[in-house]
């Protein structure tokens, strides 16, 4: 099998479940050519400990105001929850940057109209409904709702009355905030959040509208817009983004310290900050955000109530994507139990039953089904890596999930495959060049709206198959590697199909970033394939999706080219000053992992281990399961 032979380093897998704690090793640090700064990474060196959630907490009826006026809460469970959220967020502020905006950039009197914490919100609207909602998505009926040993506190209601034109009024805000909010609605889509299907147009309409109500969220959303705008500005400065990001973090911590955790606007703020950390490749802080979001979700939602409103549905979709992704990549269980995923499926099925011809519910149903399978995968891998399941049971469950994945792929609703939405005009097709590795103009891959999600979710399914194959314990490594290589080519084809389509939605390549990163590990090692991958990685970096230092070092070792640890392309092609500044900033935040789980995620050790095991089998004639290769 020419092209796959690479020197093997590091220990091989010690058990059939590919435990993530001991797979792979760091290459020589001399591969890292990125310039060093004099500052240490305050975030990376801080040890964050996330206690297990309490088994129960007492019900309470006090509102936020009474909590704020009392120096100490009599509810120990409440204080514990607050501490968990605060601890989970403590790492995220960039302490080397100023926390306040300059007087020219921020007017307290102008922003005061938008400043709202848990107990005081301006009335707003939604075009989907004019019903009165509490910030947790539960219709107000009583001060506290019992949920089997825990309580959900109902905070004052917000009326979501979004104007018919779908635009919020932010004319009272400072000009820079207005500018970046306008940029957000014109240029940022759900795809920038790696959300492939936004059934309620949450990211396009609701999110900017909610941001105007809550200053921490406002600064997070404006910061996200500024980040993307700055990348496209040759004269852009890192501080242009950081001033909003730091302000959001500061205000969020202040809000939480005032015991205002049960506030859906704080939850959305945390999720927005979490998204920013994903762009930085900052898994240390990302996991802190995730833990904080989990604590807030379990405080203000139940599996049933979360599906009652567009805001709740968007939050749970947003959160569970991270919950499953982080769990699978790190080899540990999801935080949310299966019940939450079941309710998502049941809700979408009920909506589909009521409106069987609506594309959005068909697509939502497909998406949540795949998310539920991802949940099953994460739980199996976690049990396997911890020795909580025997080899035979692991193999049986692995096969069951394999069958579920194959069934998901083969049972698409015919309405989602209607040919009228297939892209058939490839007049933009370019000539074949020597560096090409796939045909991105094949009919049947690319759908236009409203079925464009088909193209993205099929790519995601293919990457999930690679992840699942990497955990197989009873198939010869060579066979698994060949199957993963086939899937890798498919991902590359889909990626380039979307990349070259002139009519692709804004941000359409962002959800494919994890897919192409996984595929890159299982392509041939010749210079043609390597340069193809490096160009795609460079493209994603220029979009703001930064590959962290440890990942670049791994790929430099894989490609046997130390320069990749500095930049993907020769002669710093495409490495603009602002991109270099952002990458340096991201590198500082990624200096050190604070626990084993975070290091596992940063390095995707189990995938590198599977690849190395297969290559060892090819070079020695034996695979790690004991099979002799013919």
Q: Whereabouts are the PLM-identified features?
A:
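Short glycine-rich or small-residue beta-strand-to-loop segments that form or flank ligand, phosphate
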Residues: 270-277, 516-519
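The substrate-binding groove and active-site-proximal loops of carbohydrate-active enzymes
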Residues: 280
């Amino acid at each position: 099998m020419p092209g796959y032979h690479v020197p093997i380093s590091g220990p091989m897998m010690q058990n059939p479940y590919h435990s993530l704690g001991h797979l792979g090793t760091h290459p020589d640090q001399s591969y890292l050519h990125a310039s060093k700064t004099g500052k240490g990474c305050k975030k990376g060196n801080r040890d964050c400990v996330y206690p297990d959630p309490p088994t129960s907490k007492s019900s309470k009826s006090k509102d936020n105001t009474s909590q704020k006026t009392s120096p100490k809460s009599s509810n120990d469970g409440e204080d514990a929850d607050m501490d968990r959220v605060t601890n989970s967020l403590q790492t995220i502020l960039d302490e080397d940057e100023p926390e306040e905006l300059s007087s020219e950039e921020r007017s307290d009197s102008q922003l005061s109209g938008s400043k709202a914490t848990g107990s005081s919100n301006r009335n707003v609207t939604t075009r989907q409904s004019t019903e009165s909602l509490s910030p947790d998505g539960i219709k107000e009926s009583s001060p506290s709702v019992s949920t089997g040993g825990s309580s959900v506190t109902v905070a004052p209601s917000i009326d979501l009355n979004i104007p018919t034109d779908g635009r919020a009024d932010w004319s009272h805000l400072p000009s820079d905030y207005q500018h970046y909010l306008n940029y957000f609605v014109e240029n940022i889509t759900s795809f920038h959040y790696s959300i492939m299907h936004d059934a309620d147009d949450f990211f396009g309409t609701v999110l900017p509208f909610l941001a105007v109500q809550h200053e921490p969220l406002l600064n997070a959303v404006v910061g996200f817009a500024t980040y993307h705008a700055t990348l496209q500005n040759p004269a852009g400065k890192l501080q242009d983004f950081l001033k909003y990001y730091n302000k959001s973090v500061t205000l969020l911590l202040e809000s939480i310290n005032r015991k205002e955790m049960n506030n859906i606007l704080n939850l959305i703020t945390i999720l927005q900050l979490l998204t920013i950390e994903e762009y930085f490749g900052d898994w240390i802080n990302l996991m802190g955000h995730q833990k904080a979001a989990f604590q807030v979700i379990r405080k203000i939602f139940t599996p049933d109530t979360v599906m009652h409103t567009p805001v709740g549905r968007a939050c749970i979709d947003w959160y569970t994507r991270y919950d499953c992704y982080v769990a699978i990549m790190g080899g540990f269980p999801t935080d949310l139990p299966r019940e939450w995923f079941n309710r998502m499926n049941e809700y979408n099925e009920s909506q589909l039953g009521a409106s069987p011809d609506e594309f959005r519910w068909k697509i939502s149903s497909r998406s949540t089904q795949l998310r539920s399978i991802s949940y099953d995968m994460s739980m199996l891998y976690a049990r396997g890596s911890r020795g909580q399941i025997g080899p035979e049971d692991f193999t049986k469950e692995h096969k069951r999930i394999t069958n579920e994945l194959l069934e998901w792929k083969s049972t698409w609703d015919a309405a989602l495959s209607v040919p009228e939405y297939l892209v058939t005009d490839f007049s933009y097709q370019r000539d074949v060049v020597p560096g090409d590795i796939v045909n991105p103009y094949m009919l049947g891959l690319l759908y236009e709206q409203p079925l464009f999600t088909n193209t993205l979710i099929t790519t995601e399914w293919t990457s999930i198959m690679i992840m699942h194959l990497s955990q197989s314990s009873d198939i010869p490594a060579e066979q698994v590697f060949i199957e993963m290589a086939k899937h890798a080519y498919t991902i590359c084809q889909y990626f380039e199909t979307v990349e070259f389509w002139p009519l692709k939605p804004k941000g359409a390549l962002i959800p494919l970033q994890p897919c192409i990163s996984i595929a890159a590990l299982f392509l041939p090692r010749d210079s043609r394939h390597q340069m193809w991958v490096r160009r795609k990685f460079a493209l994603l970096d220029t979009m703001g999706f930064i590959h962290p230092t440890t990942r670049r070092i791994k790929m430099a070792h894989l490609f046997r080219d130390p320069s990749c640890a500095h930049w993907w392309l020769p002669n710093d092609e495409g490495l603009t000053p602002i991109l270099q500044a952002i990458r340096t900033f991201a590198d500082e935040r990624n200096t050190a992992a604070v626990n084993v789980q975070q290091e596992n995620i940063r390095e995707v050790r189990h995938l590198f281990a599977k690849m190395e095991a297969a290559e060892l089998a090819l070079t020695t004639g034996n695979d790690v399961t004991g099979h002799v290769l013919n």
